[in-house]
Amino acid sequence: MDRTAVVADGASKPAGPYSHAVRSGDLLFISGQGPFDNQGALVGTTFAEHLRSVFDNLAIIARAAGGDINDIVRLGAYLEDYSNFQEYNAFMGEYLRPPYPARTTIPVPTLGIPIELDAVIAMPPRATQPPTA
């Protein structure tokens, strides 16, 4: 099975030895994204600003791979403070178009950032290349 790493200019920089995303077949697996800019600085002070930053990072990575954030089939959410769930839920419903992805939301009080999201996106098939002689 082929695996292709995706590097997305403009998304938050990986904080360790991992890729923004990896494409395997027609699926794109996006690593956990926090509310950081491309220099690694925390974006915003409110939960709403953090939400926008995290979803924007997912969208940047999806586009860099040739995909679309609205093709997410699975979304994992990790919330430092679970009292933010309703705001997260409402924002997701506004940012993404139906049909909405399968989703898991887990409270992680020791996360150290307000929210982290990871995602799996269904990608358009790659163009088939003719065999070389």
Regions found by a protein language model. Give the residues of each.
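N-terminal presequence-like segments and the immediate start of the first folded domain
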Residues: 1-56, 60-73, 79-133
